[in-house]
């Protein structure tokens, strides 16, 4: 496998002006990811600041309902409320080691923006966040938190005003001042080395999960995670990829249905194309134009996907299914009532797949769901969904 690719997917599809920064980043990542002092400092931050390891929680009531052993990897209990901080704090620390004074990031649901702003405050870095204007409205709480932490928010007004446009704006800002800015990419997407680097920093989820299962003397049969760009899924999948006995299942945003125009099911409905500096699966028309996407979740409405997932899909090492807005919201309510946990809308897509998977299983199975974030940020969206405001 070529270093910049997963099979046919990955690469560096950016202007020549960006190549210096990508090479600089690759060299720094390769150097510091092996540096014992960097690793020790990051490990200490993850333990004492982020709150790792996160628990692997046996969901007793869900297990009783579905007649299988269901465990939740509780990334929602991290500082800032999601898995995003694992990667953001590592990249921010890397930026500091590289002598950068300013970091920028794109964000959809606001969790990566919040994590980046948090890391910037801790490490004394200037921070600017690019967020689609639509997402600024539906994630107002996270926007206020980011501003409170000292970040400057750019509400992107172009296109659908969501994650794709925010990412494009962040890349443009980075390329415009490439020597001084460090771009903290939030998902396992973008030009190499970003997909590899983000997966590396998020792989702590799967490493912990593996150790926790061993302590419980359990062998996992299925691992399920929501997929937008794909960082939480890459994080929990990575250490299990070589174990063919473990079935890996990614859940895309089915929106109003994959046979409508209102979804973000990139692997189920997309084709190979180029987006945000990488070759991957993309939702595009016959002319190669990126299609508009929809999801009730601000963190999953992305028309591309990380190249690792495109490779796992093509090689059939992982399965990818779509869950609709309605199925997701029903799962969110079910977890609240059964386990007393309010999950993020993104994570609830993964939970919803239990309803489809469990009736098909012939033997009692051990199922791990990556609960990638908590639902505090989604309260307004959940209320609007119940009222039917989202769809008019």
From Swiss-Prot:
Report the EC code(s) recorded for this entry.
4.2.1.20
Reactions catalysed, as given in the entry:
(1S,2R)-1-C-(indol-3-yl)glycerol 3-phosphate + L-serine = D-glyceraldehyde 3-phosphate + L-tryptophan + H2O
Instruction: Write down the required cofactor(s).
Output: pyridoxal 5'-phosphate
Q: What pathway does this protein act in? A: Amino-acid biosynthesis; L-tryptophan biosynthesis; L-tryptophan from chorismate: step 5/5
Which residues does the record list as N6-(pyridoxal phosphate)lysine (modified residue)? 84
Q: Which EC class is this protein assigned?
A: lyase
InterPro entries from the xrefs? Trp_synth_b_CS, Trp_synth_beta, Trp_synth_beta/beta-like, TrpB-like_PALP, TrpB-like_PALP_sf
What are the record keywords, sorted?
A: Amino-acid biosynthesis, Aromatic amino acid biosynthesis, Lyase, Pyridoxal phosphate, Tryptophan biosynthesis
User: In terms of domain of life, where is this protein from?
Assistant: Bacteria
GO CC, alphabetical: cytoplasm
MF (Gene Ontology): tryptophan synthase activity
Describe, as the record does, how this protein assembles with itself and its partners.
Tetramer of two alpha and two beta chains.
What does the protein in this record do?
The beta subunit is responsible for the synthesis of L-tryptophan from indole and L-serine.
Spell out the HAMAP family in the cross-references. Answer: Trp_synth_beta
Annotated family: Belongs to the TrpB family.
Q: Please state what the protein is called.
A: Tryptophan synthase beta chain
Q: Look up and give the organism this protein is from.
A: Campylobacter jejuni subsp. doylei (strain ATCC BAA-1458 / RM4099 / 269.97)
């Amino acid at each position: 496998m070529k270093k910049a690719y997963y099979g046919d997917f990955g690469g560096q599809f950016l202007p020549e002006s960006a190549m210096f920064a990508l090479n600089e980043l690759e060299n720094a990542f390769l150097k510091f990811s092996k540096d014992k002092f960097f690793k020790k400092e990051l490990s200490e931050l993850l333990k004492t600041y982020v709150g790792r390891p996160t628990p692997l929680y046996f969901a007793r009531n869900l297990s009783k309902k579905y007649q299988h052993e269901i465990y939740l990897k509780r990334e929602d209990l991290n500082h800032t409320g999601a898995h995003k901080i694992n990667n953001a704090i590592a990249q921010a620390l890397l930026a500091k080691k590289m002598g950068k004074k300013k970091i920028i990031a794109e964000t959809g649901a606001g969790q990566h923006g919040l994590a980046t702003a948090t890391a910037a405050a801790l490490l004394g870095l200037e921070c600017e966040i690019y967020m689609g204007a639509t997402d600024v409205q539906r994630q107002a709480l996270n926007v206020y938190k980011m501003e409170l932490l000292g970040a400057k928010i750019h509400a992107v007004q172009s296109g659908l005003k969501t994650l794709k446009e925010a990412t494009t704006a962040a890349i443009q800002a980075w390329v415009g001042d490439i020597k001084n800015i460090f771009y903290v990419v939030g998902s396992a997407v973008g030009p190499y080395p970003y997909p590899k680097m983000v997966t590396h920093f998020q792989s702590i989820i799967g490493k912990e999960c593996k150790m926790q299962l061993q302590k419980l003397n359990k062998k996992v049969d299925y691992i399920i995670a929501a997929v937008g760009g794909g960082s939480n899924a890459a994080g929990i999948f990575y250490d299990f990829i070589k174990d063919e006995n473990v079935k890996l299942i990614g859940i895309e945003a089915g929106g109003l249905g994959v046979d409508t125009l209102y979804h973000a099911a990139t692997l189920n409905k997309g084709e190979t194309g180029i987006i945000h500096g990488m070759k991957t699966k993309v939702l595009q028309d016959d002319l190669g134009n990126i299609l508009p996407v929809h999801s009730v979740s601000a963190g999953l409405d992305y028309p591309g996907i990380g190249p690792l997932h495109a490779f796992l899909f093509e090689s059939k090492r992982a399965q990818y299914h779509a869950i609709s807005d309605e199925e997701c919201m029903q799962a969110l309510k079910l977890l609240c009532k059964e386990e007393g946990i309010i999950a993020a809308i993104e994570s609830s897509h993964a939970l919803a797949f239990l309803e489809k998977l469990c009736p098909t299983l012939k033997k009692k199975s051990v199922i791990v769901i990556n609960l990638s974030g908590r639902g505090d940020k989604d309260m307004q969206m959940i209320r609007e969904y119940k009222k039917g405001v989202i769809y008019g």
